[in-house]
Amino acid sequence: MTERNDFLENSPGKPTEKNNSGQLGQGWPALGLALAFFALATVAFTWPLTIKLWDYLPDWGDPPDVAWKLGYIARNLLHNPLNLNQNPYFYPLTDSIALNELLTGLGILGAPVYWLTGNTTLVFNLLNFGSFWLSGFSMWLLVRHLTGSFGAGIGAGLVYAFSPWHYGQYGHLPLTAQQWMIFSLYGLVRFLESPVARPRSKRHWLWLAFFVFFFVLQALCAGYYAYFEAILVGCYLAYFFLFRSGLVWQGWH
């Protein structure tokens, strides 16, 4: 039993303790720097969006339709919260917003802006801006944790946020909202890396809650990405239990 505990304590899945608080790429200063960097990168890549948030849409195809639906979800959240996907489309059919891509999560996130301004264009643009910004930051957060490198996180974040595939979806808000699956994966990584101990610490369970919250949020923001993140999480779980945890690898030796 002692050998087993020693193995788990020193297994690859157990994070090592480092005192990096004084380094530029570590701690709260690094978080602030990364957030600022990806905010500026998003301004550059989406220009002139930031100076036309109130009255600009990328095109006249999907964006006006999505913006209108976001407004309906925000109104329903106040006046008809049990029927968030209800609108006049295809009356008398109910929940017609849900016939297309799932927008429930985005509508809830954008609701406070709509309540304050009544401007669905502003809601659409802020959510669109945030999707690029947080896509970069979420990938930076994950890669910086896995590699310990601030620069590697920046590079990975730029690729994830502004790759031709993602940037090409600029006018399709549900498909730009890919950031939550990476936050979800980050929470899962931190949860599985928590030291094996009894009883579990509160922080351990907070990481599990972090994972579940963002997993569900991603599914509510884009139904397509619910399948993407299920595959992503499944692949990571297979990798972790086969190679990092030592639970399977030890048996092979």
For the regions a language model picked out, list residue spans one by one.
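Start-transfer (signal-anchor) and selected internal transmembrane alpha helices
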Residues: M1-W47
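Basic polycationic patches enriched in arginine
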Residues: R4, R198-R200
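Membrane-interfacial entry segments at the cytosolic side of transmembrane helices
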Residues: W28-P29, K202-L206, G246-H253
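Membrane-interface starts of transmembrane alpha-helices
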Residues: P29-L33, W115, N119-L127, G148-A156
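Generic alpha-helical secondary structure signal
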Residues: L35, N100-A111, G153, G157, ...
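Membrane-embedded helix bundles of polyisoprenyl
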Residues: F38, L127-P195, R203-S245
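Membrane-interface coil-to-helix junctions
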Residues: A41-S135, S163-Q178
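Transmembrane helix-loop junctions in multipass membrane proteins, especially transporters and channels
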Residues: T50-W54, N119, S194-R198, F241-W252
